[in-house]
Curated annotation (Swiss-Prot):
The gene is ruvA. Residues 1-64 are annotated as: Domain I. GO terms for molecular function: ATP binding; four-way junction DNA binding; four-way junction helicase activity. Residues 153-208 are annotated as: Domain III. The keyword DNA damage applies. GO terms for cellular component: cytoplasm; Holliday junction helicase complex; Holliday junction resolvase complex. Homotetramer. Forms an RuvA(8)-RuvB(12)-Holliday junction (HJ) complex. HJ DNA is sandwiched between 2 RuvA tetramers; dsDNA enters through RuvA and exits via RuvB. An RuvB hexamer assembles on each DNA strand where it exits the tetramer. Each RuvB hexamer is contacted by two RuvA subunits (via domain III) on 2 adjacent RuvB subunits; this complex drives branch migration. In the full resolvosome a probable DNA-RuvA(4)-RuvB(12)-RuvC(2) complex forms which resolves the HJ. Pfam families: HHH_5, RuvA_C, RuvA_N. Its main location: cytoplasm. This is Holliday junction branch migration complex subunit RuvA. InterPro entries: DNA_helicase_Holl-junc_RuvA_I, NA-bd_OB-fold, RuvA, RuvA_2-like, RuvA_C, RuvA_C_sf. It comes from Methylorubrum populi (strain ATCC BAA-705 / NCIMB 13946 / BJ001).
Amino acid sequence: MIGKLKGIVDSYGEDFVILDVNGVGYVVHCSARTLQRLPKPGEATDLAIETHVREDMIRLYGFRSDAEREWFRLLQTVQGVGTRVALGVLSVLEPAQLATAIATGDKGAVARAPGVGPRLAARLVAELKDKAPAFAPVDPALVALTGAVEDRTAPQPVADAISALVNLGYPQVQASAAIAAALKGLGDGAETVEAKTLIRLGLRELAR
């Protein structure tokens, strides 16, 4: 089995790169995010590889990090998720973002992936929620905050601030993370903060 390839980028296809390794061209399928981060043809790169062997073919999947490869494997443990859908998810969410989205139950972020509808997004979140923190650090405060917003137990200024950031076009998981960071920075002052202040601080966090 091939676990890693290091070579020269030969050319690109719609969803793959041809990597020249000592004169042999390997077709390696990648997420759109990974393809965008690879160098131009003629330059060197390396990829972590997942090898799938079937009776009629051998297919290679490439990743910029071991974490991305682990998520590729984990996503496929959920019914209805094959290699194409797994790559689609990793095309819109990098590993840390995916871990946070699943840990906080942000089905909307997961559903942005091609081939993932609301029902499959809900299944992914439900089945992988307990496993997500093992793949990337997830802020417990963010998880608690997201749960409070969903349960309608979060202070109104907090809920309003998150809603405002979402209305500005930020994904739910990013909006929640920004407000969680703002609240942490306020310390004791978080108990009396107004929504407009949280929005301003949240935008500052998002701009970093």
